[in-house]
Amino acid sequence: MKQYQTEAIVLRASAVREADRTLVLLTRDRGKLRVWAHGAARPTSRKRGAVQPFCRSRFLLERGREIDVVRQAEALEEFPALHADLEALALAGYVCELAEGFAAEGQAEPGIYGLLLQVLRRLAEDKSGLPVRFFEARILALTGFGPELGSCAGCGAQPVVPARFSPALGGVLCRGCRDRDPPARPCRSAVVQVLGKLLEWPLDRLKVLRIDAATGREVADILQACVCHHLEREPRSLAFLRKMGISSS
């Protein structure tokens, strides 16, 4: 099959020459794709709106020897609010970078696709940081890296009174195991409770959650440490958020 159709969210668009773009797409049925959009940046191009970052679009793609080519593109959902506000733009860029980092190439990713679409819709109206925490926790869980909260990640003891959290070991450590991973960070019971709700509650229900500033920072630090550990790097967009002083906690 030389041509095929797919629905995708544009994770990233990079300029090539004056009017061409290379795109990183996230699809339900084919996972992550890298494609070439010839002439997409021309003012008269019908593809132009459909290839913008964060846009949900329907694509007609043609297989190429090295990279597939966009033949047609139709925007289904454009999220103008995410482009109109620097903070929303930066947060959306961060979750899209995480989706790109965790999604498999050429393998169906319906869970990550649905999660990303849900969070982009929420970020268009809510920049509290909670949708981002929800995304971090859920994408870790979807890809098999969800934090272990109910038992000690060191010895398996249940129930566990958390003393520290270890991204490397994948969860909370009891007092007896707290020195097994020196980089592990202190972790209070209140933080574990919030992490549990992020993993269990639907996004709409989290609106009722009241989190004090200190707990919010600790939750953000733990989830971002997990993300960096499993990606084996710090996302560039996370560094940008910090540089710009944009709070994602």
Curated annotation (Swiss-Prot):
GO-annotated biological processes: DNA recombination; double-strand break repair
Entries under InterPro entries matching the protein: ARFGAP/RecO, DNA_rep/recomb_RecO_N, NA-bd_OB-fold, RecO, RecO_C
Keyword presence, DNA repair: yes
Keyword DNA damage: yes
Top-level lineage group: Bacteria
Keywords: DNA damage, DNA recombination, DNA repair
A Pfam family recorded for this sequence: RecO_N
Gene Ontology, cellular component aspect: bacterial nucleoid
PANTHER family, A to Z: DNA REPAIR PROTEIN RECO
Cited HAMAP family: RecO (MF_00201)
Family recorded in the similarity comment: Belongs to the RecO family.
Functional summary from the UniProt entry: Involved in DNA repair and RecF pathway recombination.
Protein name: DNA repair protein RecO
Source lineage: Bacteria, Bacillati, Bacillota, Clostridia, Thermoanaerobacterales
